[in-house]
Every structure is written in structure tokens, then in C-alpha cells.
């Protein structure tokens, strides 16, 4: 978990921008606020920053972020925070924004489930997919008593699967990634997918097929989990059934179900903002249907949208940049070059240190 050294100050204090959501997009937006010399406050519903990357996939490796050939999810989150932290953004954790009000002077109040009200000149919604919960296998009934001990919906620690017989359900990126990722640690890995081909990234799918060909893993396509067996609250077997009626039984200690998540906008759906399916419609400036209220990341929609981390980081940059004309109306917006800004900050810091040393 990230060590946050700058918790929010008095919630009555005005900030230039309220950022709803502390995932990668929200954190990078805070950095961009610092780059553009505006103050911000991140409000995150979870007990830590990082969104799904920190809460669900901290050990998952990511390969499609510019400049990182390969990076564990939690390391990416920590790197993003290291960038943002230098500008001391306020951070509010464990609070969910339930309502916003646009005042007559054009500023905003955002109210959370705790009753706190936060004030800002503009708002950026970077809440990812909203509230999310894993998709389950309805045919298994209520298996909540096994969740976190034998049945998992995400990999938070590889140690949970070390030396275990693991059955993975799914055919997308997460299922394929962890099929490959757990080979070295698990006693055995069995992948079960109800489709006839994988939907995950081609490179990873090729690695899975190669592992299957050399006998490292077992793969069952066009097959579903029919039922499971347990003994004294511990998983022992997984029963499979194929589309042609064939049946198999696999000895197992862990069932890892990776078939996606159900998202829910929650209070956001009642905010009288233009929606497209389960996302907020934005224009080319990342502005929603309300002036002064922007959206970025997975929660934002426009034609041709790609829901990947890289896109969210770019959208955060655009949203903050374009919010300046609303936050500081009439002021000329100048391009900010990071190398120039950092050099000036470093020079100012050195000058300050020299002055302190001279005074001593």
C-alpha cells in the first residue's frame, strides 16, 4: 500500500480541481495539476490509491505502457504516485462521492458518503469503471465461504497459489496472463474456457498454446465448470463439462475465476450527465455535458475510445490542460515543457537551500 504523506487538509478549503478516483488516471491527473500550477484534491473510495491495479492485480505484469517493457502493476502505481507526490496533492481515502452541486458562481461542491463537502473550481471524474465486482459462476451457487481460501477472483499474491493445483477459468487477458504467470509457482495449472478460442492478447495466447503443447499445462476449450467438491471447507475437485457432453474431474486446491467484472456507475448514473452505455460522454476537450466537469480514463466515452492505461494517462493530461480555461478564465494558457519546469524547480530549490545555509 502506498504511504501517503499528504492527507487532505480542511475539506472546506477551495481547490482548483477535485479528482474523483485515485487509479492511474486520477494519480496522473494530480501530477498534471502540479505541472500546470493548479491545486487539486483526489477523492478515492478505497483505502489506498491505485484503483484495480492496487486492489486486484498488484503482482500482475503490464506490458503496454510507454517506457516500461514490463512492469508489475503496483510498481506502476508507485511510480505514478512518485510523480504526483512532488506537488503535494490532497488525498482523501475511504470516501465515495455521492453528489455534486454546481453553484451560481460556477464552482463545485462534491459531497461524499461521510457527509463531507469538498469545494473546487472544476471537477475531473476518473472513477474507472465505477464500482465493480467480479463475475461469478452461477452454476456453483453460493461459494462465498470458500472465497479467499480456495476460490479467488483475482491474484493479489502469488504466494496464495504456490505449490497448489490451480484451475483457472476464463479466456481473456487476465486468465491467460495468470495461466502463464503461475506455471513456475503452482504444482499444476489447468485452464478452462467455454469458448473455442482465446480472447486475450495474441502473444500471451501463443505462450499458453506452447505450454499446452509441451505438457506444462492442461487446457480445456468449449468447456465449463459444472460443479466443485469440498471437504471441511477446502476445495478438493473441480468437475468439468464440455459442449459435447464430455465430463472430466480435476483434482484442485485453488479455483481462480477470471471472467471479468460487472461495473456499476452507482451515484454517477444519477448525476444528469450524458451517458453512453456505462460511461460519460465527453468532447475533444474531455468535457462532459456540464461545463467545468470533465472525465478521463475508462469512465469517459467518445467514438473510437480504447480502454487501456495509456489512453487514460493521455486523457488525464488533456482534461487538466483544458480545465485551465474554466479554472482561470481569461488567462493565457501556455505550453508547459516538463524539462524546463523541472529545471526551474531544481534551481529554485538550490537557491532556497543556499539562502538557508547562508542564514545559518
UniProtKB/Swiss-Prot annotation:
Binding site for FAD: 25, 44, 52, 57, 97, 132, 298, 339
GO molecular function: ferredoxin-NADP+ reductase activity; flavin adenine dinucleotide binding; NADP binding
EC number, as in UniProt: 1.18.1.2
Disulfide bonds: none
Cofactor or coenzyme needed: FAD
A Pfam family per the record: Pyr_redox_2
UniProtKB keywords: FAD, Flavoprotein, NADP, Oxidoreductase
Comment on bound cofactor: Binds 1 FAD per subunit.
EC category: oxidoreductase
Reactions accelerated catalytically: 2 reduced [2Fe-2S]-[ferredoxin] + NADP(+) + H(+) = 2 oxidized [2Fe-2S]-[ferredoxin] + NADPH
InterPro entries (alphabetical): FAD/NAD-bd_sf (IPR036188), FAD/NAD-binding_dom (IPR023753), Fd--NADP_Rdtase_type_2 (IPR022890), Ferredoxin-NADP_redctase_2 (IPR050097)
Origin: domain of life: Bacteria
Assembly, per entry: Homodimer.
Recorded family membership: Belongs to the ferredoxin--NADP reductase type 2 family.
Record protein name field: Ferredoxin--NADP reductase
Lineage, highest ranks first: Bacteria, Pseudomonadati, Chlorobiota, Chlorobiia, Chlorobiales
Amino acid at each position: 500500500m502506498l504511504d501517503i504523506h499528504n492527507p487532505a487538509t480542511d475539506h472546506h478549503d477551495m481547490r482548483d480541481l477535485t479528482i474523483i478516483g485515485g487509479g492511474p488516471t486520477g494519480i496522473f491527473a494530480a501530477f498534471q495539476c502540479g505541472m500546470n500550477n493548479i491545486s487539486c484534491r483526489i477523492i478515492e473510495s478505497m483505502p489506498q490509491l491505485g484503483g484495480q491495479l492496487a486492489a486486484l492485480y498488484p503482482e500482475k505484469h503490464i506490458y503496454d505502457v510507454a517506457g516500461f517493457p514490463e512492469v508489475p502493476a503496483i510498481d506502476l502505481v508507485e511510480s505514478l504516485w512518485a510523480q504526483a507526490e512532488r506537488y503535494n496533492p490532497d488525498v482523501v481515502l475511504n470516501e465515495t462521492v455521492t453528489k455534486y452541486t454546481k453553484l451560481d458562481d460556477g464552482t463545485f461542491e462534491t459531497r461524499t458518503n461521510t457527509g463531507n463537502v469538498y469545494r473546487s473550481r472544476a471537477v475531473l471524474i476518473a472513477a474507472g469503471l465505477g464500482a465493480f465486482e467480479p463475475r461469478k459462476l452461477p452454476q456453483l451457487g453460493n461459494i462465498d465461504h470458500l472465497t479467499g481460501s480456495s476460490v479467488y477472483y483475482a491474484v493479489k499474491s502469488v504466494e496464495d497459489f504456490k505449490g497448489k493445483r490451480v484451475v483457472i477459468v476464463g479466456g481473456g487477458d487476465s486468465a491467460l496472463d495468470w495461466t502463464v504467470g503461475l506455471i513456475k509457482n503452482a504444482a499444476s495449472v489447468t485452464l478452462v474456457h467455454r469458448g473455442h478460442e482465446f480472447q486475450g492478447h495474441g502473444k500471451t495466447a501463443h505462450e499458453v498454446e506452447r505450454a499446452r503443447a509441451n505438457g506444462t499445462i492442461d487446457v480445456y476449450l468449449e468447456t465449463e465448470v459444472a460443479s466443485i467438491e469440498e471437504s471441511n471447507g477446502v476445495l478438493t475437485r473441480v468437475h468439468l463439462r464440455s459442449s459435447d457432453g464430455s465430463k472430466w474431474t480435476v483434482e484442485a486446491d485453488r479455483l481462480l475465476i477470471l471472467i471479468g467484472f460487472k461495473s456499476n456507475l452507482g451515484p454517477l448514473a444519477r448525476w444528469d450527465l450524458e451517458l453512453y452505455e456505462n460511461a460519460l460522454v465527453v468532447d475533444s476537450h474531455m468535457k462532459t455535458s456540464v461545463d467545468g466537469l470533465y472525465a478521463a480514463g475508462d469512465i469517459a466515452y467518445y467514438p473510437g475510445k480504447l480502454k487501456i492505461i495509456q489512453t487514460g494517462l493521455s486523457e488525464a493530461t488533456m482534461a487538466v490542460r483544458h480545465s485551465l480555461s474554466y479554472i482561470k478564465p481569461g488567462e493565457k494558457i501556455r505550453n508547459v515543457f516538463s524539462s524546463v519546469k523541472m529545471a526551474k524547480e531544481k534551481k529554485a530549490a538550490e537557491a532556497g537551500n543556499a539562502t538557508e545555509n547562508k542564514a545559518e
